[in-house]
């Protein structure tokens, strides 16, 4: 109970800080055009890296967060959607749209295989299984009510996350940065559907992989690379063949 109260208090303090920063640094209209257009693609959780990254992007005067796309990974899309909506409500940014995306591992047996690989090869430095560690929720609304004991103020958009990525990049060629801190499957789905967007993105910043150390869930694999391998191979292949100046950046996790 004390831990729950402490977590709630920390969350309220952080949300208040974000709201304060936003009020103090509200960008002028003349500066709006210069802000970097960003799509955040995340397997969203409350606070931690995903939630904090979203709030920083939402409140930065240098960033124009066009939308948040939710993908399977640390959480099911239903859980991630509820989390993103709750946090955007908390900082008063219900104007930022949320899109639900890829909610499966492509290979239907991937979750079971991950557990078997852990048994055979041993664990990495934690026992994280993400969405594989709990049953898929019935809906994002059910997750919201269960986790926050409240009713949501906003709703996710009807458009699929991959379609939103495609539409936004085509609308703003050479201007959109994709910050992918989830599994990357939404971006892979977008590139599968519309490979012509590869040279139109400004850059892709992707957080995944374990460099110069063992993986976090298995000695041979970092969680996100281990969860969805095939889409990531397509993703890197498509962007690698692009003749544009789109930059492909990795942020290592260890």
Question: What residues fall within each predicted segment?
Answer:
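Bacterial N-terminal signal peptides
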Residues: 10-23
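N-terminal acidic, glycine/proline-rich low-complexity segments
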Residues: 27-254
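Positively charged n-region of N-terminal signal peptides that target proteins for export
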Residues: 1-10
């Amino acid at each position: 109970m004390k831990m729950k109260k402490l977590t709630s208090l920390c969350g309220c303090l952080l949300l208040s800080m974000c709201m304060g920063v936003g009020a103090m640094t509200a960008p002028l209209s003349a500066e709006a055009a210069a802000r970097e257009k960003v799509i955040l693609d995340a397997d969203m959780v409350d606070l931690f890296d995903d939630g904090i990254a979203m709030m920083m992007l939402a409140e930065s005067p240098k960033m124009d967060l066009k939308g948040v796309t939710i993908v399977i990974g640390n959480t099911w899309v239903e859980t991630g959607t509820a989390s993103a909506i709750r946090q955007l409500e908390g900082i008063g940014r219900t104007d930022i749209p949320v899109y639900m995306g890829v909610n499966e591992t492509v290979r239907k047996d991937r979750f079971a295989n991950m557990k078997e690989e852990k048994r055979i090869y041993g664990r990495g430095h934690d026992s994280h299984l993400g969405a594989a560690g709990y049953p898929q929720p019935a809906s994002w609304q059910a997750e919201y009510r269960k986790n926050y004991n409240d009713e949501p103020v906003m709703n996710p958009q009807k458009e699929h996350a991959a379609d939103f990525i495609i539409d936004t990049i085509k609308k703003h060629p050479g201007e959109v940065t994709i910050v992918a801190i989830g599994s990357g499957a939404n971006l892979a789905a977008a590139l599968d559907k519309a490979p012509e967007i590869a040279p139109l993105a400004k850059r892709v910043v992707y957080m995944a992989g374990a460099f110069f150390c063992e993986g976090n869930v298995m000695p041979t694999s970092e969680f996100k690379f281990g969860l969805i391998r095939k889409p990531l191979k397509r993703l890197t292949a498509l962007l690698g063949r692009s003749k544009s100046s789109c930059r492909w950046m990795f942020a290592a996790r260890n």
